[in-house]
């Protein structure tokens, strides 16, 4: 079953709430951007401070490449028109001395973010249920001059990221999940790392992080497994899926659930305000 709305591309980090039920006012802080700073900054990019100026941090965001928040636009005096210009993104190399970045800098902010299959790619991936409460690596910080939006993401994985990884997964976002039904054929025993299914349409793409469920009496039962290798169905008939260690026997009707988006926050030690 396809999701609506569909997630077609990464869009950066979108602030949605604060952790712990705190009141979220959507407040921001202004930081200067250096005259003629040469790197573009897009709406939804993580930013850091360099000598007091907002800049793009070194990739990947982690406990070494720390951040001060997420860029939500800027304003400056247009050097040609001499009028104040408000912009979704900073294009880079602007000859103005009053460039001001608008930054969501609260370290308790929760962000909605899409997963991609690679750090610099735009192909949408999946965040596994196995990783909730664990760490995940962030993608590279690029964006679109057409929309002004970032294409930063988190990177699909079948195992938790290192303790230095930039983000902690707080929860999955069910609204945009994609469910694909198929039929169990063989394998799929507890501790196994593969299962054979049938009934998948040709060209169906299943990214790493796609979770494997049994459909039992109309209810989803998690098998404790997720795809550890991406799979594209090339022929009708049987498809072998490579998965993490299975906890519950796969059987009957199988539902493969992709989760393109998750709620995350910056890990402790990644945000500059949480560093001693």
Model-identified regions with their sequence ranges:
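Surface-exposed, low-hydrophobicity beta-strand/loop segments enriched in small/polar/acidic residues
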Residues: 1-186, 190, 198, 207, ...
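Active-site-adjacent substructure of cysteine-protease-like catalytic cores
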Residues: 203
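Signature of Asx- and small-polar-rich beta-strand/turn repeats characteristic
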Residues: 237-243
């Amino acid at each position: 079953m396809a999701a609506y709305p569909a997630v077609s591309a990464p869009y950066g980090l979108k602030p949605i709430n604060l952790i712990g039920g705190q009141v979220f006012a959507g407040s921001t802080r202004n930081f200067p951007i250096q005259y003629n700073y040469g790197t573009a900054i897009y709406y939804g990019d993580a930013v850091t401070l360099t000598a007091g100026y907002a800049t793009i941090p070194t990739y990947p965001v982690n406990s070494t490449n720390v951040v001060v928040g997420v860029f939500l636009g800027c304003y400056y005096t247009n050097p040609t028109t001499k009028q104040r210009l408000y912009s979704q993104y900073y294009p880079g190399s602007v000859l103005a001395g009053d460039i001001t970045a608008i930054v969501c800098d609260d370290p308790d902010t929760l962000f909605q973010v899409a997963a991609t299959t690679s750090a610099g790619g735009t192909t949408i991936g999946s965040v596994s249920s196995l990783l909730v409460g664990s760490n995940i690596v962030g993608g590279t910080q690029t964006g679109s001059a057409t929309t002004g939006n970032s294409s930063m993401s988190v990177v699909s994985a079948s195992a938790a990221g290192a303790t230095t990884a930039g983000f902690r997964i707080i929860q999955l976002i069910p609204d945009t999940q994609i469910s694909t039904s198929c039929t169990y054929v063989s394998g799929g025993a507890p501790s196994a790392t593969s299962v054979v299914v049938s009934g998948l349409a040709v060209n169906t793409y299943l990214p790493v992080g796609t979770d494997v469920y049994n459909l039992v009496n109309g209810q989803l039962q998690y098998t404790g497994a997720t795809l550890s290798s991406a799979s594209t169905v090339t022929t009708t008939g049987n498809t072998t899926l490579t998965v993490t260690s299975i906890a519950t026997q796969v059987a009957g009707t199988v539902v493969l659930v992709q989760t393109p988006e998750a709620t995350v926050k910056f890990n402790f030690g990644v945000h500059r305000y949480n560093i001693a």
